[in-house]
């Protein structure tokens, strides 16, 4: 359970909250922080679900069974890269481990693989890639698609 707000109130109720949740995470005084982090977590869940939908759309167009399409994740652990990639991006570190122009080539292959199947996430990501490349990030890491979402450096 994510909790934020005045510490005096948290101290008064934390024992009761511990009985309701296996994991209690007090985030500090900022009252809206728990709600913000909750929607950030849900956002990742939605992004993953959209990604799975797009994988299944490509699979459908290519005649690959859904079970076979998702079997790649028994060997390719994308979740394992999440924390490290997120930290790099959050710090504005776009040193390339997967160059954006190469990622955009793969994106073209994905869009082609989907054919006329409806896609959830890939077209929006492709547009953001094109914007980042146009803004000079082509040789940077794929994470540079988040550059416009970061605060301005001072």
Q: Model-found features: residue ranges?
A:
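Helical "substrate-binding/catalytic lid" subdomain
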Residues: 33-145, 149-152
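Hydrophobic alpha-helical segments
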Residues: 11, 153-154
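Acidic-glycine-rich active-site phosphate/pyrophosphate-binding loop
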Residues: 14-31, 78-87
